[in-house]
């Protein structure tokens, strides 16, 4: 099987980001964005998706969390797009419902080459740790755009920590399922068009 890894860097006046991704990893992760709860969520994504991930971001957190979260989403999405490559043999579609106590996240993904993001729901508290709750949805919108995937997400619950964590775990599981190699496809692109 082809090596499905990528390394992406992004440097702007607002952030300096470095990301590595291995789609066929073991869930190993090293994450340092300066936002503890966001680090925890990226670790949950890696662990539950069985992706080996490193993320380092030095951002302008003295302004707010927006640039850091968005630019990590850009870099991780770009790394995903590079790592998945021509998408030969992948499952392509997947869906997961993941609970965390009272909260439930629903995730549907199509590794389609088309960037679409829909989010249904909201977060019960405006912040969790140093993360503005709505930035969790914005992160996945940014990821979907730069990964060129269709991603439909929803959350329901009473505790924003649980809602966001269920969302990150759910995306990890769904993306892992969608990128798994199906031996029956024998390296073919999963599309009637022959290309994604």
Curated annotation (Swiss-Prot):
Report if keyword Lipoprotein is assigned.
no
> CDD domains annotated for this entry?
IGPD (cd07914)
Q: What class of enzyme is it?
A: lyase
The source's superkingdom equals: Archaea
Pathway the protein takes part in: Amino-acid biosynthesis; L-histidine biosynthesis; L-histidine from 5-phospho-alpha-D-ribose 1-diphosphate: step 6/9
Listed A to Z, the keywords are: Amino-acid biosynthesis, Cytoplasm, Histidine biosynthesis, Lyase
Q: Kindly list the places in or outside the cell where this protein is found, as annotated in its UniProt entry.
A: Cytoplasm
For molecular function, the Gene Ontology terms on record are: imidazoleglycerol-phosphate dehydratase activity
Q: Name one Pfam family in it.
A: IGPD
Q: Name one GO biological process term.
A: L-histidine biosynthetic process
Query: Where, if anywhere, are coiled coils annotated?
Result: none
InterPro entries from the UniProt entry: IGPD_sf, ImidazoleglycerolP_deHydtase, ImidazoleglycerP_deHydtase_CS, Ribosomal_Su5_D2-typ_SF
Family membership: Belongs to the imidazoleglycerol-phosphate dehydratase family.
- What name does the UniProt record give this protein? Imidazoleglycerol-phosphate dehydratase
Q: Report which gene this protein is encoded by.
A: hisB
């Amino acid at each position: 099987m082809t090596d499905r890894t990528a390394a992406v860097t992004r440097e702007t006046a607002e952030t300096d980001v470095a990301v590595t991704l291995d789609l066929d990893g073991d869930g190993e992760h090293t994450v340092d964005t300066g936002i503890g709860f966001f680090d925890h969520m990226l670790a949950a994504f890696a662990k539950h998706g069985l992706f080996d991930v490193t993320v380092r971001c030095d951002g302008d957190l003295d302004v707010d969390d927006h640039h850091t979260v968005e630019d990590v989403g850009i870099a991780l999405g770009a790394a995903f797009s590079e790592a998945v490559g021509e998408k030969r043999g992948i499952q392509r579609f997947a869906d997961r419902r993941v609970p965390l106590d009272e909260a439930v996240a629903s995730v549907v993904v199509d590794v389609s080459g088309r960037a679409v993001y829909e989010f249904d729901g909201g977060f019960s508290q405006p912040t969790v740790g140093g993360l503005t709750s709505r930035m969790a949805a914005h992160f996945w919108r940014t990821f979907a755009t730069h990964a060129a995937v269709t991603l439909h997400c929803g959350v329901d619950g009473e505790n924003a920590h649980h809602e966001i964590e269920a969302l990150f775990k759910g995306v990890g599981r769904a993306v892992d399922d969608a990128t798994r190699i199906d031996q029956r496809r024998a390296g073919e692109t999963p599309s009637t068009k022959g290309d994604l």
